[in-house]
Regions:
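Conserved Radical SAM active-site core
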Residues: 1-134, 142-146, 156-157, 168
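Surface-exposed amphipathic alpha-helices with a cationic face
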Residues: 105, 128, 160-170, 251-257
Length: 293
């Protein structure tokens, strides 16, 4: 746990209309995230909340008016954890995400949870009560040393163990291979590791912008100097050939192994055992919602 400044704040509503490509509502029971991921795009939230502290060192715990009519969200998609992790370590004490799920019981909305934690296992009893629920874990490496350099979340093995348990409980799971670090993330290795207990594998490339670009580029230069020219080409000279070639390689790999493959799609449903659907999100702005598989 890396958050040093924790405060409780009152908000009118925890439900926010989403501008994300996945649509629906974006719900974040916390402001900030103690995982302190070095590449996290959500660090931009600082400028809207008055925080000047380093990302990962603060956490606002939201208190909201109770959701009394969960049917208001019927037919919607509710994404929990778009700019925080609802199952960050402090959730074990504050229980805001569990409270949210309790208040949403009865809705037929599609619940989508994004996490890097295994604390979600605590709420399996609640998750089973929703007709449509998906839990996704971010996994962009099988190398625990690289993982530890990038975030303060639980180990990859704990994430995968949780994914397997949720899958076996009958809940749809996603392995979110994000962000893909050029020359470092081994996409096929991750797919082969998780294929028996996940329905979808989302693939998203590393985007470097804002303050964390300098940090990541410095890290690559110091820890992976042989990769630095590649990062220079992609992120300073805006060359796209690496991603274009990787896209072709993934498509060929999917065809060879008979994995369904989609581009910028958000299919719903369970996959065949050991045949997860691979979804390429290299171009988020063109995502098509709910297209049939």
């Amino acid at each position: 746990m890396s958050a040093e400044i924790i405060r409780e704040i009152d908000v009118q509503s925890v439900m926010t209309k989403s501008s994300l490509p996945v649509g629906g509502y974006s719900v974040n029971p916390y402001v900030g995230c103690p995982h302190a991921c070095r590449y996290c795009y959500a660090s931009f939230m600082k400028r809207f909340t008055g925080h000047t502290e380093a990302w990962g060192t603060f956490l606002d715990v939201k208190r909201w008016k109770p959701i009394t009519n969960p049917h208001k969200y019927d037919g919607q998609r509710i994404v929990i954890g778009s700019v925080t992790d609802g199952y960050n370590p402090f959730e074990e004490f504050y229980g805001r995400t569990r409270l949210l799920l309790e208040q949403l019981r009865g809705t037929n909305a599609e619940i989508m949870i994004c996490t890097k934690s295994d604390l979600v296992l605590r709420d399996l009893d609640l998750l089973k009560q929703f007709p449509k629920v998906t839990v996704s874990w971010s996994v962009n490496t099988l190398d625990e040393n690289f993982r530890a350099d990038m975030d303060h979340a639980v180990s990859i093995e704990r994430r995968l163990a949780a994914m397997k348990q949720v899958y076996e409980a009958g809940i749809r799971t996603v392995c979110f291979v994000s962000p893909i670090f050029p020359g470092i993330t081994d996409v096929p290795a991750i797919i082969e590791r998780v294929k028996t207990f996940t329905d979808l594998i989302w693939l998203e490339n590393l985007n470097l912008r804002g303050q964390f670009k300098t940090d990541i580029m410095t890290y690559i230069r110091e820890k992976y100097p042989q990769k630095y020219p590649l990062y220079e080409a992609i992120y300073n000279r805006k060359e796209m050939s690496y991603w274009q070639n990787l896209e072709l390689e993934i498509a060929a790999y999917a065809a060879q192994n008979q994995y369904p493959y989609r581009i910028n799609d958000l299919p719903y449903g369970r996959a065949k055992q050991s045949k997860p659907v691979l979804v390429n999100y290299f171009y988020h702005e063109k995502i098509r919602l709910n297209n049939p598989r």
